[in-house]
Design a protein with these regions (language model features):
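Residues within mature, well-folded domains
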Residues: 17-164
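Sec-dependent bacterial lipoprotein signal peptides
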Residues: 1-15
Length: 164
């Protein structure tokens, strides 16, 4: 338990520094090394067309944001996006492959299989602007594609009286 608490504290501290890190980066100017110096080793690297690639910086399960930072073929940062937004969630539709969901949203905070229903819930914690903590869930029945989605209050959020 102490180990998990330490991990959660470290993740929250890291996420708290994100606005400062972001302010130090500039699209078209900052290099991949600049990004890695500020954000560290990415959780995943996604290849893009034309020699570009996207670095995934995951703030789950303790945080409420995930960042995708695209590095162009020229080695310069071309985009920095916080991807856990209602607009991105609206793009997740039934039938979409989970690999594409993972690519769009980053690693979920939690994956929970429910044996009786045959469903698996993939949950991402996020903030509905300005400060409402919610959970976006993608439900699969075959483990490979989206059956449906839903958004619910984040009952584990400190704002709701139950910190992690």
């Amino acid at each position: 338990l102490a180990r998990w608490a330490a991990i959660a504290v470290a993740a929250l501290a890291s996420a708290a520094c994100d606005p400062q890190r972001i302010s130090e980066l500039e699209e078209g100017v900052s290099t991949e090394m600049d990004v890695r110096d500020r954000f560290g080793v990415p959780d995943n690297v996604w290849n893009e067309p034309g020699g570009a690639h996207t670095l995934e910086y995951n703030r789950q399960p303790a945080g409420q944001r995930n960042y995708m930072i695209t590095i162009g073929a020229d080695g310069k940062m071309s985009a920095l996006r916080q991807v856990l937004t209602p607009e991105n969630f609206a793009r997740i539709t039934p039938g979409m492959e989970m690999q594409e969901v993972r690519r769009r949203l980053g690693k979920p905070a939690k994956v929970t299989p429910y044996a009786l229903s045959g469903e698996t819930h993939h949950d991402w914690r996020f903030l509905e602007p300005p400060t409402t903590p919610l959970v976006f869930s993608v439900i699969t029945t075959d483990g490979r594609s989206v059956a449906r989605t839903m958004t619910t209050p984040d009952m584990d959020a400190p704002e709701n009286g139950r910190g992690r």
